[in-house]
Amino acid sequence: MSTNSSNPNEVMEKVQDLKIDDSKPKVDSEEQPEAESDGESATDGAQKKKKKKKSKKKKKITAIDNSYPDGVFPEGEWQEYPLDVNSYRTTSEEKRYLDRQQNNHWQDFRKGAEIHRRVRHKAQSSIRPGMNMTEIADLIENSVRSYANNDHTLKAGIGFPTGLSLNHVAAHYTPNAGDKTVLNYEDVMKVDIGVHVNGHIVDSAFTLTFDDKYDSLLKAVKEATNTGVKEAGIDVRLNDIGEAIQEVMESYEMELNGKTYPIKCIRNLNGHNIGDYLIHSGKTVPIVPNGDMTKMEEGETFAIETFGSTGNGYVLPQGECSHYAKNPGTDDIVVPGDKAKSLLNVINENFGTLPWCRRYLDRLGQDKYLLALNQLVRAGIVQDYPPIVDIKGSYTAQFEHTILLHPHKKEVVSRGDDY
């Protein structure tokens, strides 16, 4: 997700059409224990013993490779390109041949997407009101690590910090150490998960709610994202995608507490193309028309994401920063101080140019690193990404998919049964 730099006068603060059953989980049935051999009858012994609940064993997550030993992973959803000028691509044998030459490249994305689907299924079935943000982040990220069978290495694993932005916070929030924020029944939480394999990042997000009063907000954003996916393709102008997205998104409104709110595109948030080990790589995909006549090209990978809001439809940075990433092309910059050099070595060895958060540094045993981290930010070696917010009291939602522009068709690689 990328942001625009324009800044209007309004002051303000990353979806799935999902309903989670917040009722209490079913209690496992109880069984009668066997009587002890102390001369008592089985009945007497059973009456004196307390009934014991069956212990429910948690299913252990195993590496995704175990499910696909041949290394061939499920394909995503195939869509034909929207422009008539591209109709020949569907039947072109030459284009199919070119696509096969990049098979390993595509398999990395498909592996990451299958991990993503399994992780978000676990998240959707496990997250409940009352959990704190660190519990939720750990649930998701530890699942990614287990399926990838890598502990956040540069080979495969977490593509970026899990976004868990609540309500008017649209993106770039994940808990830092000590954060006590708890998920409430009336919250609107954007769940943004990244998985990478050999630097090929699958970026996909949904919004989780428990109260059906947000249904129209979620539907608006989900339909807008699907519109962006449908309109995207080789030779399509970025401006035209934004125009189509806005038309769908802003045809919706939401009633809340007796008041009707128009649902607005958050106009300074965009989709983006994805590079190797780079979550943002050059082009941005607007969600409103912006005059950008740049075209999508064959072989590119894009994250098509849209954000809707009941607020001003514009976000600004606010709050404690948790997200960071090393800027590419900064190896020649002089590193300010020994502690900053040491921290930079840790960043290079564990993340490269993939985004990361403070919790990941904590997990690696780093401590007292904030001064050195701020020095790297000021030197331009590391980029900080603070939370971005719409006006307080508003609600924001997000849906996102990763698409692959094959020579003959596009593949919505992150598509699942859920969204």
UniProtKB/Swiss-Prot annotation:
Bias kind Basic residues: ranges: 48-61
EC number of this enzyme: 3.4.11.18
Classification via PANTHER family: METHIONINE AMINOPEPTIDASE 2
Alphabetized HAMAP family for the sequence: MetAP_2_euk
Family: Belongs to the peptidase M24A family. Methionine aminopeptidase eukaryotic type 2 subfamily.
Function: Cotranslationally removes the N-terminal methionine from nascent proteins. The N-terminal methionine is often cleaved when the second residue in the primary sequence is small and uncharged (Met-Ala-, Cys, Gly, Pro, Ser, Thr, or Val).
Name under which the protein is recorded: Methionine aminopeptidase 2
Species of provenance: Debaryomyces hansenii (strain ATCC 36239 / CBS 767 / BCRC 21394 / JCM 1990 / NBRC 0083 / IGC 2968) (Yeast)
Gene expressing this chain: MAP2
